[in-house]
Amino acid sequence: MVPLWWHISLGVALFVIGAAGVLLRRNILVVLMSLELLLNSVNINFIAFGRYYADFRGQIFAIFVIAITAAEVAVALGILVALVRNKSTLKVDDVTVMKG
């Protein structure tokens, strides 16, 4: 059996990569993919801890996170398509639609 710390270190590494992508990138699509990487790294940790403690709730919570993530991606891609049609850009800095 694989030790728990391998799963935790993989989850932490993916979380750091995703957080760096969200904070450092200016392309909306890359930020969205980095956010997905963040959520999937959390899912890895949920499943790893659930398996380590022989509890199925970690897997159930990961399934809920995946379902919520799918809805979030659908809404975000719809907004992304609307922004590309209106502004013709994918840069975060160029999008000031919500500014008053």
Curated annotation (Swiss-Prot):
InterPro entries noted in UniProt: NADH_UbQ_OxRdtase_chain4L/K (IPR001133), NUOK/Mnh_C1-like (IPR039428)
Homology family: Belongs to the complex I subunit 4L family.
Keywords on record: Cell inner membrane, Cell membrane, Membrane, NAD, Quinone, Translocase, Transmembrane, Transmembrane helix, Transport, Ubiquinone
Bilayer topology: Multi-pass membrane protein
Subunit annotation: NDH-1 is composed of 14 different subunits. Subunits NuoA, H, J, K, L, M, N constitute the membrane sector of the complex.
Domain of life: Bacteria
Protein name: NADH-quinone oxidoreductase subunit K 2
Compartment annotation: Cell inner membrane
GO molecular function, one term: quinone binding
EC number(s) per entry: 7.1.1.-
Swiss-Prot/TrEMBL GO biological process terms: ATP synthesis coupled electron transport
TM region(s), chain numbering: 4-24, 28-48, 60-80
Coiled coil: none
Annotated Gene Ontology cellular component terms: NADH dehydrogenase complex; plasma membrane
Reaction equation(s) it catalyzes: a quinone + NADH + 5 H(+)(in) = a quinol + NAD(+) + 4 H(+)(out)
Native source species: Sinorhizobium fredii (strain NBRC 101917 / NGR234)
Pfam families registered for this protein in UniProt: Oxidored_q2
Protein task: NDH-1 shuttles electrons from NADH, via FMN and iron-sulfur (Fe-S) centers, to quinones in the respiratory chain. The immediate electron acceptor for the enzyme in this species is believed to be ubiquinone. Couples the redox reaction to proton translocation (for every two electrons transferred, four hydrogen ions are translocated across the cytoplasmic membrane), and thus conserves the redox energy in a proton gradient.
